[in-house]
Amino acid sequence: MKFLIVLAVAVACASADVSHIAKSDEYAAPVVKSSYDITPEGHFQFNYETGNGIYAQAEGAVKNVNSEYPAIEVKGAYKYTSPDGQPIDLAYVADENGYQPQGSHLPTPHPIPEAIARALAYIEAHPPSPSVVERKVVANLLG
């Protein structure tokens, strides 16, 4: 019985239609230009360009080297054409504040409704007094 199952699986694999799986030249794109520069101080810079129109570049350095919390700051960009034909052009900064991409293809947040913006401005202009906040915290702790 096990032999028949193994034989059936082997026959199914051998006769599977794989003609729809097409190999693309995208995977074999030649590198047209490439440069890398790394210094002992922690600075780096690189860029490359491929034959199918992909381009990327970045540069970075260690900030606050002698502090307790050194951080790496990287600025870069890349561009390519998406499979649906849309040109993708993205610039980014990555530092202690996180990854911050910018590009016309990225979604943008909806504008803040006017009523919410007014409420936020009012709260900022009229902060609660510290005694009110302290009383509420103590009341919550006591129960």
From Swiss-Prot:
Leader sequence residues: 1-16
Pfam families registered for this protein in UniProt: Chitin_bind_4 (PF00379)
PANTHER family, alphabetized: CUTICLE PROTEIN (PTHR10380), CUTICULAR PROTEIN 65EA-RELATED (PTHR10380:SF238)
Function, in words: Component of the cuticle of the larva of Bombyx mori.
One MF term in the entry's GO annotations: structural constituent of chitin-based larval cuticle
UniProt entry keywords in alphabetical sequence: Cuticle, Signal
Protein name: Larval cuticle protein LCP-17
Keyword Signal: yes
UniProt xrefs under InterPro entries: CHIT_BIND_RR_consensus (IPR031311), Cuticle_Struct_Prot (IPR050468), Insect_cuticle (IPR000618)
Gene Ontology CC entries for this record: chitin-based extracellular matrix
Domain Chitin-binding type R&R: 41-110
